[in-house]
Amino acid sequence: FLRWADGDDVLIDCEREAAGDLARRLTLYRLRRAIVIAREEELVVHWSATGDDGVADPRLAALGRRWLAPATGGAAVDDGWRAHRLAHGVAEGRAELGSDKLLWLECNAAELNGVSFAKGCYVGQENTARMNWRQKVNRRIVVVPLSAADLARQLAAYPDLGWSVEHRRVEAIDPALSPPWLAEALAGSSPGQPV
């Protein structure tokens, strides 16, 4: 998910199917605050590979721009978005990242600006901080051409687009097939720098 400031509100861009579960989980951390956690059914995510609309996707500049607005008649984030995102090697959502099955750094969170090592406490901090400190992430989510797929490691396949999303051991990832933004991590350097 992505977080958006909206005046006094905070909007979270997440999969429609995951919104209910996310709202329930966030409610657990409300801690007696008088805040409302609710779904905004009328808003959908829109995107553009270029242009000035919305804001740059915080994960990777090449992903283009995103914004939240009412639906305009069709699927706002569609197969075009999926093809664009996978071509840049970025996995997202439950189908590709699982749900509570993978460690956060295995999902390339450090490389895609999804974690801060300077922030205080958060759920999962212990494992995430230890993996970063030890500079050891044994497995990674990678997007590879379907022709190079390892079915035993496959999390999602898109035959129409020619891509496979997989959870592979780092030594089994061919650097020639990985995106440039992941090269430093695969070369054995630190999985990320403070954001």
Which sequence ranges carry the predicted segments?
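Basic, glycine/lysine-rich polyanion-binding surfaces/domains
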Residues: F1-V195
